[in-house]
């Protein structure tokens, strides 16, 4: 009986230790229209990850998002490669995360510059960054290329464009 209890205790301790060693995952996202937010929530659930919304200090209005207007806020920000829109607040710490999914709508064939603000405000070296995006017509390819070029010291995976994904597409993405 003592032997059985000893084995059970050993197994419980080993299981508890391995559970604590699991990598912690974060899904951080910016969503202007709500589409990326829906995808981020699906990824968070499938990956059993924490969810964090990257919010601008000044919310974007529909006029700000009018890409046909060269004077709209988003157009002006995206023309300036050094533009870094201020976030309302930053996540308290990313230290505990090993994997960070970063989601965004594709703007002008790249990630909105608030994504750069988030990356530059946090220490992401040594973490695996997996981008995901939503878009009405662009791919994620150039966005990833631009992020890798801007942040060569970060480990940025290929990522995926996820427009209205199915549950199985989300599950496949997080594997």
Language-model features: where?
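Short, glycine-/small-residue-rich phosphate/pyrophosphate-handling segment
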Residues: 130-163
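Bacterial Sec-dependent N-terminal signal peptides
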Residues: 1-21
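Glycine-rich phosphate/pyrophosphate-binding loop and the adjoining helix
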Residues: 17, 155-175
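Structured segments of extracytoplasmic/periplasmic soluble domains
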Residues: 42-46, 50, 103, 117-122, ...
């Amino acid at each position: 009986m003592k032997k059985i209890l000893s084995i059970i205790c050993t197994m419980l301790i080993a299981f508890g230790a391995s559970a604590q060693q699991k990598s912690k995952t974060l899904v951080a996202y910016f969503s202007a229209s709500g589409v990326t937010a829906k995808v981020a929530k699906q990824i968070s659930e499938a990956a059993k990850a924490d969810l964090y919304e990257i919010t601008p200090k000044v919310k974007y209005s529909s006029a700000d998002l009018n890409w046909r207007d060269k004077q709209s806020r988003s157009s002006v920000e995206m023309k300036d490669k050094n533009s870094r829109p201020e976030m309302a607040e930053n996540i308290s710490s990313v230290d505990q995360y090993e994997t960070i999914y970063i989601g965004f709508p594709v703007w002008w064939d790249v990630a909105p510059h608030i994504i750069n603000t988030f990356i530059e405000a946090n220490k992401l070296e040594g973490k695996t960054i997996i981008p995901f995006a939503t878009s009405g017509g662009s791919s994620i390819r150039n966005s990833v290329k631009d992020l890798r070029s801007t942040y060569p010291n970060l480990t940025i995976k290929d990522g995926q464009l996820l427009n209205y994904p199915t549950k199985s597409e989300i599950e496949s993405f997080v594997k």
